Amino acid sequence: MLQNVRIAGTGSYLPPRIVTNDELSSSLDTTDEWIVSHTGIRQRHVAGPEESASTMGAIAARNALEDAGIAPEELSLVVVTTCTGDYANFPSTACLVQNAIGAANAGCMDLNAACAGFTCGLSMARAYCRLHGRPVLVVSSEAMSRVVDWQDRSTCILFGDGAGAAVLTPSDEPGMIHDCLGADGSGARSIYRECGARLPADPHKAPGALVMQGRAVFPFAVRAMEGLIRKMLAETGTRLEDVAHVIPHQANLRILEAVAKRMDVPVERFFINIGSVANTSSASVPIALDQLSRSGAMKDGDLVLTVAFGAGLSFGGNMFRWRKRAGEKT
């Protein structure tokens, strides 16, 4: 029997080391003023030598489980979304997280939709939880600092490291309402890393460094996010003014400003934290969700909409009702 599903808890983790724009400008031909004006980013968190997608993800997972009041042994599935896993393709980072948190009864899988990963993972987790009636953990964790070329000022200024997580559980009341996923595979070479079986690393570039065609990505990102928002609203018969919180992927402030303009709303209508965390790829949305939750701004019954785009080119969004935690005041 299919059941209602809600987000029962969230968690996140940001590495303690912070790299400011001024620090970057000491080794790159750029300035703090230029980076802020073109991206909205002022700083980013960078993983330490002993940190990785799995270690950061495990911390975020523990925080989410504590928030939900769920023991690791209760989990039926651990889904990790990452494009910077500890190993090249296998073993899955999900297995490493499962072992670290003691989720001995959970199945594990990695999912890679790049920056859209969490929205896709949330959709998969919702379906599994509805079918099996047991808690599911979604973790999005990225060590982007390990895959950017720190001499390429067009990309290294954009990214940061971190992890976010959410626990989904069966619910008496509707929580998760709608998902919308899509892709345009013709844009696969707009954002990529050469280091796979078909495309070995280019010897003239940093090993496996991320390559991005910014001029191609920007218009796609704006169209995809605007289109997703409008589609989810239309498919659920919802008005934008009825949505309490819009949480977009934190890729670039200019992208969010362009989406807001096309939606005819102020950019402040979106939750924005890119200035302090930069683009953390698939971890972007769950980090923002956790920060918003812990700020106290989300009330029981609030309608929330997430939207993201990423390499592939892929995109995804979710709509859900926020439900108060046990012990929380309504």
Language model: regions and residue ranges:
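A contiguous, well-structured pocket-lining segment that forms one wall/lid of small-molecule binding clefts
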Residues: 205-274
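Flexible, glycine-rich active-site loops centered on histidine and acidic residues
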Residues: 126-130, 134-163
